[in-house]
């Protein structure tokens, strides 16, 4: 399966690594460059974008994935 995980903090990063280790294609998204850098060699693709900005989200292949997981925990409003 193909996943997009938005938010690569504690939960999102572990989930991304585990899904990738199971053979799934994982696209990771976060605003924090350091978080993206840590995972860039462990997952298929990564983006440094603000997922709360609709225009930024347009670069993601949303129509080509099976599941999108929003793992933003710091700001409840951003996860909606």
Model feature map: region roles:
Residues 1-80:
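Cytosolic regulatory regions of ion transport systems
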């Amino acid at each position: 399966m193909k996943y997009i995980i938005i938010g690569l903090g504690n939960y999102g990063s572990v989930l991304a690594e585990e899904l990738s280790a199971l053979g799934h294609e994982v696209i990771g998204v976060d605003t924090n460059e350091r978080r993206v850098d840590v995972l860039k060699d462990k997952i298929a693709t990564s983006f440094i974008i603000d997922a709360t900005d609709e225009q930024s989200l347009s670069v993601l292949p949303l129509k080509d994935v099976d599941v999108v997981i929003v793992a933003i925990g710091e700001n409840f409003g951003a996860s909606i």
